[in-house]
């Protein structure tokens, strides 16, 4: 990306535990972080501080931010925010939304409408699907919707990759 000082910056957004940088502006670890409103933030209700899981309504927010415009049921209070509607598409679903707001080590704004927006201006909606069927046992299927919320067009220089590690054994 071209920074405000005219120099090129190379933003690689990583999310593994080790060797993550600290944001100079927010003084937080630079990684995708959960967006508020998509899980129950009250630890007295969501004791495990879990992301929203379809089979545990204690993890759900009071209402879903992305469903506020439903004129018949604004926010879908008390309902699961499923991929195909108010019910899970699998035996169990998880759902979380995150963004790259804390990637602020570069003199760069991805959105000219918002001078406080940092990172590449990306929002990621992630949904995990699990089934009890033996053919799909021990597997989580992940679906990612990645949205550029900023005003910067990245043309052909963005790559998406996922590294998964269950951390078994340490």
Task: Label each PLM-derived region with a short phrase.
Residues 1-170:
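A long-range scaffold signal marking pre-active-site subdomains of enzyme folds
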């Amino acid at each position: 990306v071209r920074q405000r000082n005219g120099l090129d910056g190379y933003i690689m957004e990583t999310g593994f535990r080790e060797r993550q940088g600290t944001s100079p502006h927010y003084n937080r670890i630079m990684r995708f972080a959960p967006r508020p409103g998509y899980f129950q933030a009250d630890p007295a209700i969501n004791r495990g501080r879990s992301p929203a899981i379809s089979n545990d309504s204690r993890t759900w927010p009071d209402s879903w931010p992305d469903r506020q415009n439903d004129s018949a049921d604004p926010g879908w209070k008390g309902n699961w925010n499923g991929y195909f509607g108010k019910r899970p598409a699998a035996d169990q679903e998880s759902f979380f939304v995150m963004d790259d707001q804390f990637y602020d080590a570069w003199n760069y704004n991805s959105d000219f409408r918002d001078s406080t927006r940092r990172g590449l201006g990306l929002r990621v909606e992630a949904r995990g699907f699990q089934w009890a069927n033996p053919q799909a046992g021990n597997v989580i299927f992940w679906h990612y919707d990645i949205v550029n919320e900023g005003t910067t067009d990245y043309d052909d220089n963005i790559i998406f990759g996922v590294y998964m590690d269950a951390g078994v054994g340490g």
